[in-house]
Curated annotation (Swiss-Prot):
Name of the protein in its database record: Gag-Pol polyprotein
Alphabetical keyword list: DNA integration, DNA recombination, DNA-binding, DNA-directed DNA polymerase, Endonuclease, Hydrolase, Magnesium, Metal-binding, Multifunctional enzyme, Nuclease, Nucleotidyltransferase, RNA-binding, RNA-directed DNA polymerase, Transferase, Viral genome integration, Virus entry into host cell
Note: Strain A is a helper virus of the strain T.
InterPro entries: DNA/RNA_pol_sf (IPR043502), Integrase_cat-core (IPR001584), MLVIN_C (IPR040643), Peptidase_A2_cat (IPR001995), Peptidase_aspartic_dom_sf (IPR021109), Retropepsins (IPR018061), Rev_trsase/Diguanyl_cyclase (IPR043128), RNaseH-like_sf (IPR012337)
Residues covered by region (Disordered): 1128-1152
Domain RNase H type-1 positions: 595-741
Binding-site list for Mg(2+) 2: D604, E642, D663, D733
Natural source organism: Avian reticuloendotheliosis virus
PROSITE patterns: ASP_PROT_RETROV, INTEGRASE, RNASE_H_1, RT_POL
Domain of life of the source: Viruses
């Protein structure tokens, strides 16, 4: 009965209230309805009320004779618009509530709301496989609020009553972590099994991919039912020996219980639970799939979806599935069941009449995500919205700024306009997502591909009449190598990427790829200058698969829809012609000799080592003359020299028609093949790194345009025949090798005196004239002073011009410039003029590392007034040692110079704080001030907050000025140098050698003659060898001498007394070892089995001492007490001949 009642006035005129029944299913003959009946026990016969007659659409008529007649059939005239006429033939959908109530009566055992948790009747208990190195882990229970504990108490009592939990005593323990259910005061019981998961073997996950699962749903099946299994994991039993590892603490004061509980079923939070349950349920439902081939059943762990063609088929299949689940022991949530509907929500997607779209709840959840503050929040946002990427055209291009913002390790998040625009654009795209069609595997697919800014974009469609219906929007970022290709080749990479993605939805069905590029021609005639053989093969295997894959070229794709433009007048470009124009550095460049060349040049670069130095030179020659030849800086590679020589040849050939020969494959390929590729990539290699010799390559690509016509040919080097090509190449090689050892041309530019004005006489001052006479110089007829050492005395004005010209050619510093010019000229005031010229040079000011001089007294560092008052701290990078240690945290007390250093795996603020709190402050007291550079570990918020809490001043030094931290920087160098020396002597790693390096640094005297050890402890450093008794006579201080002698006598007496009290040991120097190398011995086993041997072996003795031996096959030394001699002749060797007279066969056999 329901709580509702109705007031009734009967024939007597009295008013009485009668109750109404709950809604019951009533079959009216034309369909099912829900009706609440009025319950009147006094009524002798059932009566049809007006409400039920209205649902029957009954007509009551009265005739003259007989009782009234009730007719429920008749003709009804319906007038409707033609476009709405189809509605007359639709079946009225059955309400979800109606079916749920009916099936709760028919199949009561399957519903979770009215039954205890289920148990799969056909599944064997699960055995959990631990790692071979796993040991029990014990993690104490987190504090739980009283409200959460009350909520968990009811859940645990229910599970204990159902046998899902049981008391246990286990060495394992992990905590519970209650999680509040959204919108309620209840808590979900979650166990923190992270430590257990680390110690359990991971099985291969076989859970279906939700990205492709709905692709298995035929679009013509438009009636759906969705079932969600309740407490699904608890249906699978757990083996008793595996139950102990999932124990947790629980105390129930009301029941008077306290101890550990564990699961007897598969627990939630265990990393293998989804896979184990998915496989178990899939096996149990195999029979249902075979019995119902006309419906589709999709399973994602515990979420089930049935799809059928008609409502009747969906009803029948859903009923059978519920009965099957009830028989197997599973439970279905009635609250979440969606029964026989045309629109359902499954895995966050809304499915309706063969299409899928994003559910409103998922969209609203993403739209409410605030602007990220950390890189982790950016990754969380990308992961959440990435689940919806099929509905966002060009997702990869839109999200690229956000992906870029997550790089950089632990660096702070940089959030600018680009990141904000990308964040809002992705959210905006979610507010208007399209409805995507479910893929039909009976129809071919069309893939429209476009590439922009290194991102592949496309849309996968299927034909629906004359329209193209989208199935998915696809997008991926190209790898760095493909992103540097020309646009036509990037289209191939985009097509390959998206075809691979589309195959997850097409399942190998026919696909037509449409692009604005002629992809098929490019694939059949691949440009091997750009693509490696491996990539060509990969693309051809994936895309050249007729008739499954077909290509179609269109003029352009609409950037908004990624579908072809309808305008057929747009031109279609030719990809091969475009690639040829991009590959060639200039259109008329050829590798065949020109017939009417004005000159034929031969280039070569030479690089070789002599006296430990690498000399290099380059030359450009003809058959009878040298065009250009110069030495190159020490250390120049041969490839770089070849590029320079070829560039000089092209520069000399300006406005000429020339043939140029080179024997360098590198220079030839750079000019003909790779030069434009490097330029397109932004001077990057295939791996995304900067190319070598980038300035020389750019100069070569610029110089190739200077000749009027040019042909560059490759010839073999070091040929001995008399062909003109070989002769010219040999000549270029000889000249290049010859000039390599010459001084650089910088000195040649000033080796001769500059051109002096012929019409002007040098104007010497009186001082300069007197200087010329004093140095016994002579004047030539032109008036120039020549000194006896061969130098020329220059007036100040002329001398300044010489200095300026020399500096422009060399950009030498003040001292080197003066030294160089003084070899040829004598100039009064040369040092002042050189200083003025070098100071005024803009190029030198921009490049030279020297900074402006600091006024004396301003660059002094702060030092403490007592030990431990002021510390300088810094991280220095080391080579990676055992344990992953890569950094060294160094702290120096500025007062005493005492150093502390700690190895670290990461350069983080946690490391700094740990050693400050645990090491520095407990040992040296609270510092007044700490100084450091602006490293992330020191400017971190947590570091600064700690200093504020401790009232310690943290001084950040000037950026890019290591002198501000000079004391700790110098200590870094000292420690590294000491460790390097110790590594050379011992071969150990730097972590193990660090204590010895610290000892050396702490005991080294400073400028005042005192070491940090002396300043801190007031004692001499314990590193100087002790002075023995034989040295005491050399000491002149008689008082000190007597004291030392008395101390030595007391020491000797004490040692003698103690020596007499010790037990006498047998002399072992003459004792012969019991076992000799080569002997066979048995080794006693530590743990032998009953009825098994106690001794292992025999083993051969390798080394022996009077007390222990080392045997072959065992690492440790073994004491004599665990050895015994093995009998001799334990094995026998025999020699037998073979078919080869030079070989014999040796056979070893153990004697019985």
């Amino acid at each position: 009965m329901s709580k509702e009642s109705v007031a009734i006035i009967g024939a007597t005129g009295n008013i009485r209230n009668y109750p109404k029944s709950e809604g019951r299913l009533v079959d009216l003959g034309r369909g099912l309805v829900t009706h609440s009946f009025l319950v009147i026990p006094e009524c002798p016969d059932p009566l049809l009320g007006r409400d039920l007659l209205q649902k029957l659409r009954a007509t009551i008529s009265f005739t003259g004779e007989g009782p009234p007649e009730i007719r429920t059939e008749g003709k009804l005239l319906v007038t409707a618009p033609l476009e709405e006429e189809y509605r007359l033939f639709l079946e009225a959908p059955i309400q979800n509530v109606t079916l749920l109530e009916q099936w709760k009566r028919e199949i009561p055992k399957v519903w979770a709301e009215i039954n205890p948790p289920g148990l799969a009747s056909t599944q064997a208990p699960i055995h959990v496989q631990l790692l071979s190195t796993a040991l029990p882990v014990r993690v104490r229970q987190y504090p739980i609020t009283l409200e959460a504990k009350r909520s968990l108490r009811e859940t645990i009592r229910k599970f204990r009553a159902a046998g899902i939990l049981r008391p246990v005593h286990s060495p394992w323990n992990t905590p519970l972590l209650p999680v509040r259910k959204s919108g309620t005061s209840e808590y979900r019981m979650v166990q923190d099994l992270r430590e257990v998961n680390k110690r359990v073997e991971t099985i291969h996950p076989t859970v279906p991919n939700p990205y492709t699962l709905l692709s298995l749903l035929p679009p013509d099946r438009i009636w759906y039912s969705v079932l969600d299994l309740k407490d699904a994991f608890f249906c699978i039993p757990l083996a008793p020996e595996s139950q102990l590892i999932f124990a947790f603490e629980w105390a129930d004061a009301e029941e008077g219980e306290s101890g550990q509980l564990t699961w007897t079923r598969l627990p939630q939070g265990f990393k293998n639970s989804p896979t184990l349950f998915d496989e178990a349920l899939n096996r149990d439902l195999q029979g249902f799939r075979l019995d119902h081939p006309s419906v589709s059943l999709l399973q994602y762990v515990d979420d089930l979806l049935i799809a059928a063609d008609t409502q009747a088929a969906c009803l029948s299949a859903t009923r059978d599935l519920l009965m099957t689940l009830a028989e197997l022991g599973y439970r279905v949530s009635g609250k979440k069941a969606q029964l026989c509907q045309e629109e359902v929500t499954y895995l966050g997607f809304k499915i309706h009449k063969g299409s899928r779209s994003l559910s409103n709840s998922r969209t609203q959840a993403i739209l409410q995500i605030p602007v990220p503050k950390t890189k982790r929040q950016v990754r969380e946002f990308l992961g959440t919205i990435g689940y919806c990427r099929l509905w966002i055209p060009g997702f990869a291009e839109l999200a690229q700024p956000l992906y870029a913002a997550t790089r950089g390790g632990n660096d702070p998040l940089v959030w600018g306009e680009k990141e904000e625009e990308a964040f809002q654009s992705l959210k905006l795209a979610l507010t208007q997502p399209p409805a995507l069609a479910l893929p039909s595997l009976d129809k071919p697919f069309q893939l429209f591909v476009e590439e922009t800014s290194g991102a592949a974009k496309g849309v996968l469609t299927q034909a629906l009449g004359p329209w193209k219906r989208p199935v998915a929007y696809l997008s991926k970022r190209l790898d760095p190598v493909a992103a540097g290709w020309p646009r036509c080749l990037r289209a191939i990479a985009a097509a390959a990427l998206l075809t691979r993605e589309a195959s997850k939805l097409t399942f190998g069905q026919d696909i037509e790829i449409t692009s604005s590029h002629n992809l098929e021609s490019l694939l059949r005639s691949p440009p091997d200058k750009w693509l490696t053989n491996a990539r060509i093969t990969q693309y051809q295997v994936l895309l050249l698969d007729p008739p499954r894959v077909r290509f179609k070229q269109t003029a352009a794709l609409n950037p908004a829809t990624l579908l072809p433009e309808t305008d057929d007048t747009l031109p279609i470009h030719h990809c091969l012609d475009t690639l040829d124009s991009l590959t060639s550095t200039r259109p008329d460049l050829t590798d065949q000799p020109l017939a009417q060349a004005e000159a034929t040049l031969f280039t070569d670069g030479s690089s070789y080592i002599r006296d430990g130095k690498r000399y290099a030179g380059a030359a450009v020659v003809t058959l009878d003359s040298v065009i250009w030849a110069e030495p190159l800086p020490i250390g120049t590679s041969a490839q770089k020299a070849e590029l320079i020589a070829l560039t000089k040849a092209l520069e000399w050939s300006k406005d000429k028609s020339v043939n140029i020969y080179t024997d360098s494959r590198y220079a030839f390929a750079t000019l003909h093949v790779h030069g434009m590729i490097y330029r397109e990539r932004g001077l990057l290699t295939a791996g995304g790194k900067a190319i070598k010799n980038a300035p020389e390559i750019l100069a070569l690509l610029t110089a190739v345009w200077l000749p009027k016509r040019v042909a560059v040919m490759h010839c073999k080097g070091h040929q001995k025949d008399d062909a003109p090509t070989s002769t010219g190449n040999r000549r270029a090689d000889e000249v290049a090798r010859e000039v390599a050892i010459r001084p650089l041309s910088t000195q040649a530019t000033i080796s001769d005196a500059p051109d002096m004005p012929d019409t002007e006489t040098p104007q010497y001052s009186n001082v300069e004239e007197a200087l010329g006479h004093r140095l016994r110089g002579t004047k030539d007829p032109a008036g120039w002073w020549h000194l006896p050492d061969g130098r020329l005395l220059l007036p100040r004005a002329v001398g300044r011009k010489v200095l300026e010209q020399t500096h422009r050619a060399t950009h030498l510093g003040e001292s080197k410039l003066t030294e160089l010019v003084r070899k040829h000229y004598l100039i009064c005031g040369i040092y002042r003029a050189a200083r003025d010229i070098t100071t005024r040079c803009v190029a030198c000011a921009q490049v030279n590392p020297g900074a402006a001089p600091v006024e004396k007294g301003l660059n002094s560092r702060i030092r403490g007034a007592a030990p431990g008052e002021h510390w300088e701290v810094d991280f220095t990078e080391m080579i990676t040692a055992k344990g992953g240690y890569k950094y060294l945290l160094v702290l120096v007390d500025t007062f005493s110079g005492w150093v502390e250093a700690y190895p670290a795996k990461r350069e983080t603020s946690q490391v700094v704080i740990k050693h400050l709190i645990h090491d520095i402050i407990p040992r040296f007291g609270l510092p007044v001030q700490i100084g450091s550079d602006n490293g992330p570990a020191f400017v971190a918020k947590v570091t600064q907050q700690l200093c504020e809490a401790l009232n310690v001043s943290w001084k950040l030094h000037c950026a890019y000025r290591p002198q501000s931290s000079g004391q700790v920087e110098r200590m870094n160098r000292t420690l590294k140098e000491t460790i390097a020396k110790l590594r050379i002597e011992t071969g150990g790693d730097w972590v193990s050698l660090l204590p010895q390096a610290l000892l050396r640094a702490r005991c080294t005297p400073g400028r005042e003659g005192l070491s940090p050890f002396e300043i801190l402890y007031g004692l001499k450093p314990p590193v100087v060898p002790r002075v023995g008794c034989d040295k005491l006579a050399s000491i002149t201080n008689q008082t000190l001498l007597k004291s030392l002698q008395a101390l030595q006598a007391t020491r000797s007496l004490a040692r003698a007394t103690l020596r007499d009290q010790l037990p006498q040991k047998e002399a072992q120097q003459d004792r012969t070892p019991l076992f000799q190398p080569g002997d066979l011995v048995f080794v006693k086993k530590h743990d032998f089995q009953q009825l098994g041997p106690r001794w292992d072996g025999p083993y051969t003795v390798v080394l022996s001492t009077p007390t222990a031996v080392k045997v072959a096959g065992k690492t440790p030394w073994i004491h004599y007490s665990r050895l015994k001699k093995a009998p001799d002749n334990q094995e026998e060797w025999t020699v037998s001949p073979t078919s080869d007279p030079l070989r014999v066969k040796l056979t070893r056999r153990a004697k019985p």
